UniProtKB/Swiss-Prot annotation:
It is an enzyme of class 5 (isomerase). Substrate binds at residues 26-27, 43-44, 72-73. It comes from Escherichia coli O17:K52:H18 (strain UMN026 / ExPEC). This is L-ribulose-5-phosphate 4-epimerase UlaF. Pathway: Cofactor degradation; L-ascorbate degradation; D-xylulose 5-phosphate from L-ascorbate: step 4/4. The active site is at residues 118, 225. One of its GO terms (molecular function) is aldehyde-lyase activity. SMART domains: Aldolase_II (SM01007). The lineage of its organism: Bacteria, Pseudomonadati, Pseudomonadota, Gammaproteobacteria, Enterobacterales.
Length: 228
Protein backbone atom coordinates (compact mmCIF):
# COMPACT_ATOMS: atom_id res chain seq x y z
CA UNK A 1 0.00 0.00 0.00
CA UNK A 2 2.98 2.30 0.42
CA UNK A 3 3.18 2.91 -3.33
CA UNK A 4 -0.50 3.91 -3.45
CA UNK A 5 -0.11 6.10 -0.37
CA UNK A 6 2.73 7.93 -2.09
CA UNK A 7 0.68 8.31 -5.27
CA UNK A 8 -2.31 9.70 -3.37
CA UNK A 9 -0.08 12.00 -1.32
CA UNK A 10 1.52 13.43 -4.46
CA UNK A 11 -1.87 13.85 -6.14
CA UNK A 12 -3.22 15.69 -3.09
CA UNK A 13 -0.18 17.95 -3.07
CA UNK A 14 -0.93 18.82 -6.70
CA UNK A 15 -4.19 20.49 -5.60
CA UNK A 16 -2.55 23.54 -3.97
CA UNK A 17 0.18 23.46 -6.61
CA UNK A 18 -2.41 24.03 -9.34
CA UNK A 19 -4.48 26.47 -7.32
CA UNK A 20 -7.47 24.18 -6.85
CA UNK A 21 -7.74 24.39 -3.05
CA UNK A 22 -7.72 26.93 -0.25
CA UNK A 23 -6.77 25.69 3.23
CA UNK A 24 -7.90 22.02 3.33
CA UNK A 25 -10.79 22.29 0.85
CA UNK A 26 -10.10 19.20 -1.22
CA UNK A 27 -9.26 15.51 -1.29
CA UNK A 28 -7.96 12.85 -3.65
CA UNK A 29 -8.29 9.07 -3.46
CA UNK A 30 -7.31 5.97 -5.39
CA UNK A 31 -8.48 2.36 -5.25
CA UNK A 32 -6.80 -1.03 -5.14
CA UNK A 33 -9.57 -3.07 -6.73
CA UNK A 34 -7.89 -6.44 -6.21
CA UNK A 35 -7.78 -5.89 -2.46
CA UNK A 36 -10.94 -3.80 -2.21
CA UNK A 37 -9.15 -0.93 -0.48
CA UNK A 38 -9.22 2.83 -0.99
CA UNK A 39 -6.46 5.28 -0.04
CA UNK A 40 -7.66 8.81 0.70
CA UNK A 41 -6.51 12.07 2.26
CA UNK A 42 -7.05 12.45 6.02
CA UNK A 43 -9.76 14.85 7.11
CA UNK A 44 -8.75 18.44 7.83
CA UNK A 45 -4.98 17.91 7.76
CA UNK A 46 -3.06 20.88 6.35
CA UNK A 47 -1.17 20.30 3.13
CA UNK A 48 1.94 21.98 4.53
CA UNK A 49 2.35 19.32 7.22
CA UNK A 50 0.93 16.29 5.44
CA UNK A 51 3.08 13.23 4.67
CA UNK A 52 2.56 10.11 2.58
CA UNK A 53 2.22 8.01 5.74
CA UNK A 54 -0.71 10.20 6.80
CA UNK A 55 -2.90 8.84 3.99
CA UNK A 56 -5.75 6.70 5.31
CA UNK A 57 -6.68 3.25 3.97
CA UNK A 58 -10.33 2.18 4.19
CA UNK A 59 -12.23 -0.85 2.97
CA UNK A 60 -15.27 -0.59 0.70
CA UNK A 61 -17.56 -0.17 3.70
CA UNK A 62 -15.54 2.83 4.90
CA UNK A 63 -13.86 1.06 7.82
CA UNK A 64 -10.34 2.32 8.50
CA UNK A 65 -7.84 -0.51 8.08
CA UNK A 66 -4.65 1.55 8.15
CA UNK A 67 -3.79 5.06 9.31
CA UNK A 68 -3.70 7.28 12.39
CA UNK A 69 -6.23 9.85 11.19
CA UNK A 70 -9.89 9.91 10.28
CA UNK A 71 -10.40 9.72 6.50
CA UNK A 72 -11.82 12.60 4.47
CA UNK A 73 -15.39 13.51 5.34
CA UNK A 74 -16.19 12.87 1.65
CA UNK A 75 -15.06 9.24 1.80
CA UNK A 76 -18.58 7.84 1.41
CA UNK A 77 -19.01 9.79 -1.84
CA UNK A 78 -15.77 8.36 -3.23
CA UNK A 79 -16.73 4.83 -2.22
CA UNK A 80 -20.16 5.06 -3.82
CA UNK A 81 -18.61 6.16 -7.12
CA UNK A 82 -15.99 3.39 -7.02
CA UNK A 83 -18.72 0.81 -6.39
CA UNK A 84 -20.79 2.01 -9.34
CA UNK A 85 -18.05 2.62 -11.91
CA UNK A 86 -15.36 -0.08 -12.27
CA UNK A 87 -13.39 2.08 -14.73
CA UNK A 88 -12.58 4.69 -12.08
CA UNK A 89 -9.12 4.52 -10.52
CA UNK A 90 -8.96 7.93 -8.86
CA UNK A 91 -11.37 10.60 -7.61
CA UNK A 92 -10.84 14.22 -6.59
CA UNK A 93 -13.11 16.76 -4.93
CA UNK A 94 -12.28 20.46 -4.64
CA UNK A 95 -13.94 23.82 -4.20
CA UNK A 96 -12.00 25.44 -7.05
CA UNK A 97 -13.38 28.91 -7.69
CA UNK A 98 -14.88 28.84 -11.17
CA UNK A 99 -16.17 25.27 -11.19
CA UNK A 100 -17.75 25.89 -7.79
CA UNK A 101 -19.37 29.07 -9.09
CA UNK A 102 -21.15 27.03 -11.78
CA UNK A 103 -22.23 24.56 -9.08
CA UNK A 104 -23.61 27.37 -6.94
CA UNK A 105 -25.42 28.80 -9.95
CA UNK A 106 -26.97 25.38 -10.57
CA UNK A 107 -25.72 25.25 -14.15
CA UNK A 108 -23.81 22.75 -16.24
CA UNK A 109 -20.47 24.00 -17.55
CA UNK A 110 -21.20 24.39 -21.27
CA UNK A 111 -18.97 22.91 -23.95
CA UNK A 112 -18.03 26.04 -25.87
CA UNK A 113 -14.70 25.20 -27.46
CA UNK A 114 -12.03 22.68 -28.29
CA UNK A 115 -10.20 22.92 -24.94
CA UNK A 116 -13.33 21.58 -23.29
CA UNK A 117 -13.89 18.97 -26.03
CA UNK A 118 -10.37 17.60 -25.65
CA UNK A 119 -11.36 16.20 -22.24
CA UNK A 120 -15.15 16.26 -21.80
CA UNK A 121 -17.57 14.84 -24.36
CA UNK A 122 -20.30 17.43 -23.92
CA UNK A 123 -21.35 19.72 -21.11
CA UNK A 124 -20.06 19.04 -17.61
CA UNK A 125 -23.38 18.32 -15.88
CA UNK A 126 -24.75 19.81 -12.70
CA UNK A 127 -26.70 17.58 -10.34
CA UNK A 128 -30.07 18.37 -8.85
CA UNK A 129 -30.15 19.67 -5.31
CA UNK A 130 -30.33 17.22 -2.45
CA UNK A 131 -33.52 17.17 -0.43
CA UNK A 132 -33.52 18.05 3.26
CA UNK A 133 -34.00 14.36 4.02
CA UNK A 134 -31.00 13.43 1.88
CA UNK A 135 -28.83 16.04 3.59
CA UNK A 136 -29.96 15.15 7.11
CA UNK A 137 -29.54 11.45 6.37
CA UNK A 138 -26.40 9.93 4.88
CA UNK A 139 -25.29 13.17 3.24
CA UNK A 140 -22.00 12.09 1.70
CA UNK A 141 -23.42 8.79 0.48
CA UNK A 142 -26.37 10.63 -1.04
CA UNK A 143 -23.98 13.02 -2.76
CA UNK A 144 -22.48 10.01 -4.51
CA UNK A 145 -25.94 8.74 -5.38
CA UNK A 146 -27.03 12.04 -6.95
CA UNK A 147 -23.84 12.08 -9.05
CA UNK A 148 -24.67 8.58 -10.30
CA UNK A 149 -28.28 9.59 -10.91
CA UNK A 150 -27.11 12.54 -13.03
CA UNK A 151 -24.59 10.56 -15.08
CA UNK A 152 -27.03 7.74 -15.74
CA UNK A 153 -25.52 5.15 -18.06
CA UNK A 154 -22.90 7.50 -19.52
CA UNK A 155 -19.30 6.27 -19.63
CA UNK A 156 -17.74 8.22 -16.73
CA UNK A 157 -14.35 8.55 -18.42
CA UNK A 158 -16.05 10.35 -21.33
CA UNK A 159 -17.43 12.86 -18.83
CA UNK A 160 -14.72 12.77 -16.15
CA UNK A 161 -16.31 15.31 -13.84
CA UNK A 162 -19.47 16.90 -12.53
CA UNK A 163 -20.55 19.84 -10.41
CA UNK A 164 -22.80 19.08 -7.45
CA UNK A 165 -25.50 21.72 -7.02
CA UNK A 166 -24.65 24.28 -4.33
CA UNK A 167 -21.54 22.29 -3.43
CA UNK A 168 -18.68 21.95 -5.90
CA UNK A 169 -16.84 19.84 -8.46
CA UNK A 170 -15.89 16.18 -8.40
CA UNK A 171 -13.57 14.75 -11.05
CA UNK A 172 -12.21 11.28 -11.71
CA UNK A 173 -9.84 9.38 -13.93
CA UNK A 174 -7.88 6.19 -14.51
CA UNK A 175 -5.78 6.90 -11.43
CA UNK A 176 -5.29 9.65 -8.86
CA UNK A 177 -3.03 11.78 -11.05
CA UNK A 178 -5.40 11.49 -14.02
CA UNK A 179 -8.27 12.59 -11.78
CA UNK A 180 -6.33 15.68 -10.69
CA UNK A 181 -5.49 16.43 -14.31
CA UNK A 182 -9.19 16.37 -15.16
CA UNK A 183 -10.00 18.57 -12.16
CA UNK A 184 -7.47 21.14 -13.37
CA UNK A 185 -9.00 21.08 -16.84
CA UNK A 186 -12.50 21.42 -15.39
CA UNK A 187 -11.50 24.55 -13.48
CA UNK A 188 -9.88 26.05 -16.58
CA UNK A 189 -12.82 25.39 -18.90
CA UNK A 190 -15.23 26.66 -16.23
CA UNK A 191 -13.26 29.90 -16.20
CA UNK A 192 -13.15 30.06 -20.00
CA UNK A 193 -16.91 29.50 -20.25
CA UNK A 194 -17.61 32.25 -17.72
CA UNK A 195 -15.39 34.70 -19.62
CA UNK A 196 -16.73 33.71 -23.05
CA UNK A 197 -20.37 34.03 -21.97
CA UNK A 198 -19.51 37.42 -20.48
CA UNK A 199 -18.11 38.57 -23.83
CA UNK A 200 -21.00 37.07 -25.80
CA UNK A 201 -24.08 36.14 -23.72
CA UNK A 202 -25.69 34.57 -26.82
CA UNK A 203 -22.74 32.26 -27.39
CA UNK A 204 -23.86 28.79 -28.43
CA UNK A 205 -22.26 25.41 -27.88
CA UNK A 206 -19.31 24.16 -29.87
CA UNK A 207 -20.31 22.58 -33.19
CA UNK A 208 -20.95 18.88 -32.62
CA UNK A 209 -18.64 17.79 -35.45
CA UNK A 210 -15.78 19.82 -33.98
CA UNK A 211 -16.42 18.45 -30.50
CA UNK A 212 -16.48 14.89 -31.85
CA UNK A 213 -13.22 15.40 -33.70
CA UNK A 214 -11.34 16.80 -30.72
CA UNK A 215 -12.59 14.24 -28.23
CA UNK A 216 -12.14 11.23 -30.49
CA UNK A 217 -8.66 12.14 -31.69
CA UNK A 218 -7.53 11.91 -28.04
CA UNK A 219 -9.86 9.26 -26.61
CA UNK A 220 -11.49 7.35 -29.46
CA UNK A 221 -10.59 3.87 -30.76
CA UNK A 222 -8.41 5.42 -33.48
CA UNK A 223 -6.91 8.18 -31.33
CA UNK A 224 -3.78 9.72 -32.76
CA UNK A 225 -3.01 12.58 -30.36
CA UNK A 226 0.30 12.28 -28.48
CA UNK A 227 2.87 9.48 -28.52
CA UNK A 228 2.31 5.76 -28.19
Amino acid sequence: MQKLKQQVFEANMDLPRYGLVTFTWGNVSTIDRERGLVVIKPSGVAYETMKADDMVVVDMSGKVVEGEYRPSSDTATHLELYRRYPSLGGIVHTHSTHATAWAQAGLAIPALGTTHADYFFGDIPCTRGLSEEEVQGEYELNTGKVIIETLGNAEPLHTPGIVVYQHGPFAWGKDAHDAVHNAVVMEEVAKMAWIARGINPQLNHIDSYLMNKHFMRKHGPNAYYGQK
